[in-house]
Regions:
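Pyridoxal 5′-phosphate
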Residues: 1-173
């Protein structure tokens, strides 16, 4: 139970455990260990990812959907109070957020697209790879909440083309 930041033996043992976990997560999703940041959970990860982009690109436009997890919706609504504009896409008749609906929402000031890979209530999958390709052609960052997908489908950050991705251990432990 040592502090992983401490120099004593218990701390160093804890540090090795954290770094081993970091390597395992990176290998599981095709990332490098330096790209893995641990948070207290999915809500903090979602919040940190979205707010970090918003801070780097003030007053930019964000695209998300009206059916995202509350952690994403709340963060985006908060950012509206700080001067960001947010488009909340509505799903189509099949419950999907389509690549075309995202493309139609893109503006010259769009800085982030924040969408989940698999909806936690409907199970509908979003084509994150195609959305990422569209976004990157326009210099837009992509954040994917993949909490529902992790452990249920093969996730690879390179195949998805995302810049930021959130996962949660409680779905796979």
């Amino acid at each position: 139970y040592g502090n992983a930041s401490s120099l004593h033996s218990a701390g160093q043992k804890a540090r090795r455990g954290v770094e081993n976990a970091r390597e395992q997560v990176a290998a599981a999703i095709g990332a490098t260990r330096k790209e893995i940041v641990f948070t207290s959970g999915a809500t903090e990860a979602d919040n940190q990812a979205i707010r970090s982009v918003a801070q780097m690109r003030p007053n930019g436009h964000i695209i998300t959907s009206s059916i995202e997890h509350a952690a994403v919706l709340s963060t985006c609504k908060y950012l509206e109070t700080l001067g960001h504009s947010v488009t909340f896409l509505k799903p189509d008749e099949r419950g999907e957020i389509t690549v075309q609906s995202v493309a139609d929402a893109v503006r010259s000031d769009t800085v982030l697209i924040a969408l989940m890979r698999i909806n936690n209530e409907t199970g509908i999958k979003t084509d994150i790879a195609s959305i990422s390709q569209l976004a990157h052609e326009k210099g837009i960052l992509v954040f994917c909440d993949a909490v529902q997908a992790f452990g249920f489908e093969n996730l690879n950050v390179n195949d998805l083309g995302v810049d930021l991705l959130s996962l949660s251990a409680h779905k796979v432990y």
